[in-house]
Amino acid sequence: MAGKTLYGKLWDIHEVARRDDGSSLIYIDRHILHEVTSPQAFEGLRLAGRPLWRVNANIATPDHNVPTTKAERQGSLLSIADTVSRLQVQTLDENCDDFGIFEFKMNDVRQGIVHVIGPEQGATLPGMTVVCGDSHTSTHGAFGALAHGIGTSEVEHVLATQCLVTQKMKNMQVRVEGTLPWGVTAKDIVLALIGKIGTAGGNGYAVEFSGSTIRALSMEGRMTICNMAIEAGARVGMVAVDEKTIQYVHGRPFAPKGSDWDAAVAFWRGLVSDPDAHFDRVVELSAEEIKPQVTWGTSPEMVSAVDQSVPDPERETDPVKKESLIRALKYMGLQPNDPITSIKLDRVFIGSCTNSRIEDLRAAAEVVKGRKVASTVKQAMVVPGSGLVKAQAEVEGLDKIFIEAGFEWREPGCSMCLAMNPDKLGSGEHCASTSNRNFEGRQGIGGRTHLVSPAMAAAAAVAGHFVDVREMMR
């Protein structure tokens, strides 16, 4: 019998029943909730008179709508200026109180972005199935977990039954070998991958990231890569368990203790793909060939190395792709063959569930230390992914480095990743962003988003336009 992939092992462990239509009922170990996709689910439970199936499998925190300025975070929820945002955060509080769900409320130091606090608290563990009403739940796959986003109706289903009806996916292996050049990061790996296979390349697959480069990454770097598996079209991204995984989880609040820990570790060490496991598709990347990446268009696949130029649609033979390029360049206000380094920035955003962990902030601070944000940049902001990340950064003095350079130092939340809170782009403004999506209007109506790593965003803030961070730090 052929060996199993990591995805196959986790699927088999959690499959409760197989249905006549080919779908399966799988058990869910961890459910994470936030204020945007949960209200209708809770209301559905009330109307049906259903209790939660397993209360302690759920945790919650507000992140999408919370303001990130101190003025709106110092008081009660009444300090939230936007009435819709205030209502959503208040509703989450009330629902969690009513149903007994553990919530990291807005002014709890442990509050933060769902995909930051889950791993940070040890609520995400190897071997788990993890779901959340958010597409970037794939982040948690970095721990050898089977994690993906779900819709609001599925949120209700998980709350009521602790199970989910879903289809088994095919297996893809993305193998990255070699040593990353200095200044090239996990964000650059995943952007280069998306540039290679496109935003539909992973459709129908669970992607396992492997190879010497992936093994050399920190857990933060692995989370960045798994976070953007969805931008490559895959619902699931994952990395096999190793000693880094186990060391990261050890001692965290929700992690097993004592003899339970020993038993868990013994099980976790088997959460790797077997040597003879079959993958339906294999994609290979060489780390040495990857350069700092910058998106120039309105899809994550519209990406180039920083030393390249914006493509010319006239060289595209596919009429559909050509039209897409023309539209993207028009929206972004760019011309064919513009050097990437000629793109000037209005704003810089360092944050989001992709790049707001302590490692990300350290990388950005290293670049801006002793430098100043360019006078042409209207706003540069750093938004830590959680209150604990913020506190750690302040212990290390990173906040002072950013503030002295001219950055705004904010409270944790999703912030400018998406236009659902006060942090937004104005129409026509270009932003170097460490987030994960650059669709039209993603950061504000008419806003122009360029996805980059934290180090590249920091370098762009100082220069006022895109530069190769490797040259700046040489």
Swiss-Prot record:
<dbReference type="GO" id="GO:0051539">
    <property type="term" value="F:4 iron, 4 sulfur cluster binding"/>
</dbReference>
<keyword id="KW-0411">Iron-sulfur</keyword>
<keyword id="KW-0028">Amino-acid biosynthesis</keyword>
<dbReference type="GO" id="GO:0003861">
    <property type="term" value="F:3-isopropylmalate dehydratase activity"/>
</dbReference>
<comment type="subunit">
    <text>Heterodimer of LeuC and LeuD.</text>
</comment>
<dbReference type="InterPro" id="IPR001030">
    <property type="entry name" value="Acoase/IPM_deHydtase_lsu_aba"/>
</dbReference>
<dbReference type="Pfam" id="PF00330">
    <property type="entry name" value="Aconitase"/>
</dbReference>
<keyword id="KW-0479">Metal-binding</keyword>
<protein>
    <recommendedName>
        <fullName>3-isopropylmalate dehydratase large subunit</fullName>
        <ecNumber>4.2.1.33</ecNumber>
    </recommendedName>
</protein>
<keyword id="KW-0432">Leucine biosynthesis</keyword>
<dbReference type="InterPro" id="IPR036008">
    <property type="entry name" value="Aconitase_4Fe-4S_dom"/>
</dbReference>
<comment type="pathway">
    <text>Amino-acid biosynthesis; L-leucine biosynthesis; L-leucine from 3-methyl-2-oxobutanoate: step 2/4.</text>
</comment>
<feature type="binding site">
    <location>
        <position position="414"/>
    </location>
    <ligand>
        <name>[4Fe-4S] cluster</name>
    </ligand>
</feature>
<dbReference type="InterPro" id="IPR018136">
    <property type="entry name" value="Aconitase_4Fe-4S_BS"/>
</dbReference>
<dbReference type="InterPro" id="IPR004430">
    <property type="entry name" value="3-IsopropMal_deHydase_lsu"/>
</dbReference>
<comment type="function">
    <text>Catalyzes the isomerization between 2-isopropylmalate and 3-isopropylmalate, via the formation of 2-isopropylmaleate.</text>
</comment>
<dbReference type="GO" id="GO:0009098">
    <property type="term" value="P:L-leucine biosynthetic process"/>
</dbReference>
<feature type="binding site">
    <location>
        <position position="353"/>
    </location>
    <ligand>
        <name>[4Fe-4S] cluster</name>
    </ligand>
</feature>
<keyword id="KW-0004">4Fe-4S</keyword>
<keyword id="KW-0456">Lyase</keyword>
<keyword id="KW-0100">Branched-chain amino acid biosynthesis</keyword>
<dbReference type="InterPro" id="IPR015931">
    <property type="entry name" value="Acnase/IPM_dHydase_lsu_aba_1/3"/>
</dbReference>
<keyword id="KW-0408">Iron</keyword>
<dbReference type="InterPro" id="IPR033941">
    <property type="entry name" value="IPMI_cat"/>
</dbReference>
<dbReference type="GO" id="GO:0046872">
    <property type="term" value="F:metal ion binding"/>
</dbReference>
<comment type="similarity">
    <text>Belongs to the aconitase/IPM isomerase family. LeuC type 1 subfamily.</text>
</comment>
<feature type="binding site">
    <location>
        <position position="417"/>
    </location>
    <ligand>
        <name>[4Fe-4S] cluster</name>
    </ligand>
</feature>
<dbReference type="InterPro" id="IPR050067">
    <property type="entry name" value="IPM_dehydratase_rel_enz"/>
</dbReference>
